[in-house]
């Protein structure tokens, strides 16, 4: 699979006049699939970040027992999830992202997303036979975003 290359540019700003939710409300109407991940650990001042992820570029989704890799909305590859091949396919798809960035921010550049409760069937020897809801979402979706705003709540 051909690598998809990215170069990260960072800027630091003081964020004491805005909240993650306030920023999210501003961006969600302009950019589809904006994601807010808030820190819920207020006891420790270490690594207490919230992330606002804007404009997904690369998507990895598990739907209808298929794992697909998309770039800017176009499916590049899709393979069936069978015989416990999830980890192999996921590693293959994540390996397609070639990132050039400063080592100090490498931990912030990556995939953000979710795994649903029913997604456990891809990690364990469990086969679920629940009926899909008409408004079902992918069982697993992780995206590499064009913009990631990391808000450090204590610095």
Whereabouts are the PLM-identified features?
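Signature of the chorismate-utilizing enzyme
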Residues: 1-155
